[in-house]
Amino acid sequence: MRKIIHIDMDCYFAAVEMRDFPEYRGKPLAVGGSRVQRGVISTCNYEARKFGVRSAMATGYALKLCPDLILVPGRMQVYKEVSQQIRAIFSRYTELIEPLSLDEAYLDVSDCKLFKGSATLIAEAIRRDILAETGLTASAGVAPIKFLAKVASDLNKPNGQCVIPPDEVPEFVKSLSLRKIPGVGKVTAEKLSSLGLNTCADVQAYPKQELIARFGKFGAVLVERAHGIDDRGISVSRERKSVGVETTLAQDIYTLEQCQQVMPGLIQELSSRLGRSAKGRQIHKQVVKLKFNDFKQTTIEHRSDEVSVVMFYELLSQAMARQEGRGIRLLGVSVGLAESKDTLAPLMVRETKQLDFVF
């Protein structure tokens, strides 16, 4: 059984604006549109939603619902940069990441060994990291299948989490509204309702072949979802440019020796990830990253076409020279990957015999 997490940022664009401009906090705010030009709301905060304002709503109508609505233009470059921060956090826990947009993604953490493999605790850790490093809140859904993870992430918003364990899936889907199933929009929901089909339990009791006759391929998918079946895997379509491992330390550390004690576990996990997601790819650099307790960070890299364990330790020493007495709260190692067309040979590892562990 897989362990799927769906992360959904809370009113993302609006949340970034409230973070950067505290004067907006506690007031109805929407991103997009203008008081003088026609437009559409991209997103709005929860204060605006109390008045009925929603995403994709015409700005003029939103202002009728909430005359005091604050409208701000979108800052897409900022939203993209923060989204990259968030995805970097995801990559600490798994390489199986399927971004759906700037503010949501599926993660398959089935092979993650952190927190003894508990997807619940992993989701909590991801949300903590996002809050600590971006100042934004995220909601999470945890389930053994994708569509239920997405459903679950919406149940305890904002800044909440919902877990649907495998043994609770059959009971959970029975009462689930068909409107919650991806692909069931307003028109389809009305057609289903005209047949007396409003919940998954209704579909379970309905003749499968009749649904397929009425709705075609979607009818078959609907039957599967209504029974808690979703065989879709995580779609990682883009070619990876790097593979890395980071760990946020339980307590700040201060010495090179303490950092060296953390390195073997990171390098071992990096080796595993390279084998899973970059087999046969040529590397072109090695990188060590430190984040300090003032949340500033430094990276040191070295161009190389072979993975050298000793080089990671040399880069660590160079990074520590920039410490300036600060505590270290995060340590990471990574390699940059050459494009597939540049792949000349399998990844090679050298100098491991000088160190007493397996790479």
Curated annotation (Swiss-Prot):
Binding sites annotated in the UniProt record for Mg(2+): D8, D103
Active site: E104
Biological processes per GO annotation: DNA-templated DNA replication; error-prone translesion synthesis; SOS response
Pfam families per record: IMS (PF00817), IMS_C (PF11799), IMS_HHH_1 (PF21999)
Keyword Nucleotidyltransferase: yes
Superkingdom of origin: Bacteria
Family matches, as SUPFAM superfamilies: DNA/RNA polymerases, Lesion bypass DNA polymerase (Y-family), little finger domain
GO cellular component, one term: cytosol
Predominant location: cytoplasm
Record keywords, A-Z: Cytoplasm, DNA damage, DNA repair, DNA replication, DNA-binding, DNA-directed DNA polymerase, Magnesium, Metal-binding, Mutator protein, Nucleotidyltransferase, Transferase
Cofactor(s) essential for the protein: Mg(2+)
Subcellular localization(s) per the UniProt record: Cytoplasm
Catalytic activity: DNA(n) + a 2'-deoxyribonucleoside 5'-triphosphate = DNA(n+1) + diphosphate
EC number: 2.7.7.7
Domain UmuC: from-to ranges: 4-185
Role according to the record: Poorly processive, error-prone DNA polymerase involved in untargeted mutagenesis. Copies undamaged DNA at stalled replication forks, which arise in vivo from mismatched or misaligned primer ends. These misaligned primers can be extended by PolIV. Exhibits no 3'-5' exonuclease (proofreading) activity. May be involved in translesional synthesis, in conjunction with the beta clamp from PolIII.
Family membership: Belongs to the DNA polymerase type-Y family.
Quaternary structure and interacting proteins, as annotated: Monomer.
Listed name of the protein: DNA polymerase IV
Gene for this chain: dinB
